[in-house]
Each structure stands twice: as structure tokens, then as C-alpha cells.
A protein has these predicted regions:
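A short, Lys/Arg-rich alpha-helix, primarily the initiator
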Residues: 2-29
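DNA major-groove recognition helix of helix-turn-helix/homeodomain DNA-binding modules
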Residues: 61-79
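Short, charged recognition helix plus adjacent turn
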Residues: 77-104
Length: 104
């Protein structure tokens, strides 16, 4: 069974790379080793290295787990949709809501 590869835009790759750099800097500022963070996050060292490189094939749960270990920074993920710049970029996109059929 082959996994489907999701196409990632170059801008997204750049953002993920920057996020990875910030995660690595946060780990180094806290003087935490790769082993400590990976173990606390419940991921392998290889996955942590991929997170720090901004690899787009890493599950978002791994990013969230690492951010949680680095002083609960994962709560920042909740505020992304409130960011004005982010909101202005998605303003034109129609969000699909599930419409339920009436039982009447």
C-alpha cells in the first residue's frame, strides 16, 4: 500500500523551515538535548531532527508534541486562525460546512 504524497507549496516549505529553526533555537536556549526532547515528546531522535528541519512529511502531532515539551508553546497553535494576516489570506476561501438532511 503506497502512501499518498501531499503536494506542498514552496511558500509552505519556507514557513515550515522557519518553524523548524525556531523550534531548534527554543530547544538550544533551554539547553535541552535532542534525546531529552524526543523522549519527553514521545518521538524518535530522527523525527525530532525532521521537525527541526521543517520536514513537511512529519505529522503535525509530532510538531505539537515537541512544542508542548518546550514550555507549552503548543497553545500558540490555537491562535493561528485569529491572526489578522492569516485571516486576510484565507478570506476568499469558502469553508465547506456539512449540511445535514432534514428528517421531516
Amino acid at each position: 500500500m503506497n502512501k499518498r504524497r501531499v503536494e506542498v507549496f514552496p511558500e509552505t516549505e519556507t514557513i515550515l523551515s522557519q518553524v523548524g529553526e525556531q523550534i531548534k533555537l527554543a530547544r538550544l536556549r533551554r539547553q535541552l538535548s535532542v534525546e531529552e526532547v524526543a523522549s519527553s515528546a514521545g518521538i524518535s531522535r530522527t523525527t525530532l531532527w525532521a521537525v527541526e528541519k521543517g520536514n513537511s512529511s512529519v505529522a503535525i502531532g509530532a510538531y505539537a508534541a515537541v512544542l508542548r515539551v518546550l514550555d507549552k508553546m503548543d497553545s500558540d497553535l490555537l491562535f493561528m486562525a485569529k491572526d489578522e494576516l492569516f485571516a486576510s489570506k484565507i478570506k476568499g476561501i469558502q469553508l465547506n460546512a456539512r449540511i445535514r438532511k432534514s428528517n421531516k
